[in-house]
Amino acid sequence: MKIGITIDGVVRDFITKFESVYDKYYPVELEEGEELPKRDINTLNLLEHFEFSGGTEELNKFLYIDSSLEIFGHAGETKLNSVEHLNQLHNLIEDMGHTPIVISKELNNSKPATLFFLSKLSAKVNNIVFVRDYDKKWEHVDILITANPTTLETKPKEKVSIKVINHYNKDCDADYTILDL
């Protein structure tokens, strides 16, 4: 059996890093003593929460070309020792005779940035798969541990989903739900 584990929202804190890099390159002018308002990011539709005058094209350029290493490579872990927990889960899955697969939707420069992220935190995994679309993750696994709402919503009936609870996926259905790895 092939058991997949996604990266964003499970191991990597993509949202927090995206927000800080966005604020760095798209600063808002504030009055003296005024603080940046807290964003309530309750979906993964980044255009709902961050302004890009060029829409999806500008967002994709920012994510996958201009700021990939900063966002994907230098993001923190979702929880302390998430990558170590990934390593332990990977070994457990292998010991049980199954195939663990780390799987992520990545494009362009986010691929090497993601490999850097995994490397710098000492991920000891054997199989890493990059896909271009969220629903394509299901083609590589029988069971998938993910926090991504689109991936959860596109689950085929014969597959099993395990949702890692996050503020942007609370309303998504899954076969099983966990707090973290």
Question: Model-predicted segments: where are they?
Answer:
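Short phosphate-binding/catalytic loops that engage adenosine nucleotides
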Residues: 98, 123, 159
